[in-house]
Regions:
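N-terminal "arm"/small-domain region of PLP-dependent enzymes with the aminotransferase-like
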Residues: 1-26
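Phosphate-binding glycine-rich loop
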Residues: 25, 29-71, 77, 84-88, ...
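PLP-dependent aminotransferase-like
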Residues: 64-151, 158
Length: 241
């Protein structure tokens, strides 16, 4: 069904914007962004959640942060952005057919597509139906491949107590206005791997690996013009979590 985007009560949204306005902190990892990130980690039961401008950039950054080269087995039964992110990361998509009952990637067919050039498997959770993570994880481990999930359709979905945000090496979530939870535009990468989360940082902050607090100390010494993050979007949607 086509539905209208969910919206918080106007009064709550205005209050969030007012507090943002009063703080004068409009970008660069502000309080609203950190509050949303903390709420996401708690709700999705995952140690790390890296926020991005949209789901496409989150997936593209994830592929680049993993340092992958070669072919990525994925599914054509998805929004075009999944494939575009693979191509923009300098990788080659290899399409795998889906299962008829839940429209998710068929693990047996995925394994049959593995070649010496395969570097990762990128399945897509569909309409809230989770992929067969047990089978796909076993295949990825057997062949030494990364397992990355497009979880745009699986916000706060779990199986046997395991959150979709914890499946595979990492997962991408979209917060586009058409999603169950949205920030009008937005997305994130979730992972339990601290090193991968660290490697995502330069893709968020103009190539910089330095911890944010340390970077701010340098800015106090050497003023520059910088900008990242969208607290106007983040602030208004924390109440929805």
């Amino acid at each position: 069904n086509v539905t209208r985007s969910s919206m918080p009560p106007m009064e709550e949204y205005v209050e969030e914007i007012r507090s943002l306005w009063d703080s004068h902190w409009l970008t660069n990892n502000g309080e609203k962004l950190k509050k949303l990130e903390a709420a996401l980690k708690e709700r999705l039961d995952v140690p790390y959640a890296a926020l991005f401008t949209n789901g496409h950039l989150a997936l593209e950054a994830l592929l680049k942060a993993l340092g992958l080269k070669g072919e990525v087995i994925t599914t054509p039964f998805t929004f075009a952005s999944t494939t575009h992110a693979i191509v923009r990361a300098g990788l080659t998509p290899v399409f795998c057919d889906i299962r008829e009952d839940d429209y998710t990637m068929d693990p047996a067919r995925a394994e049959a597509l593995i070649t010496p050039r395969t570097c990762a498997i990128l399945p897509v959770h569909v309409y809230g139906n989770l992929c067969d993570d047990g089978a796909l994880s076993a295949i990825a481990k057997k062949h030494g491949l990364k397992l990355i999930y497009d979880a745009a359709h699986a916000f706060h979905v779990s199986r046997d107590g395991v959150s979709a945000a914890r499946m595979g090496d990492a997962a991408m979530f979209s917060f586009h206005a058409t999603k169950v939870f949205h920030t009008v535009e937005g997305g994130c990468v979730t992972t339990a791997d601290p090193e991968l989360n660290r490697r995502l940082e330069p893709h968020k902050e103009k190539g910089n690996f330095m911890p944010f607090a340390q970077l701010m100390d340098l800015f106090d010494q050497y003023p520059v013009v910088v900008g990242c993050g969208h607290p106007f979007r983040a602030g208004g949607h924390v109440p929805e979590l």
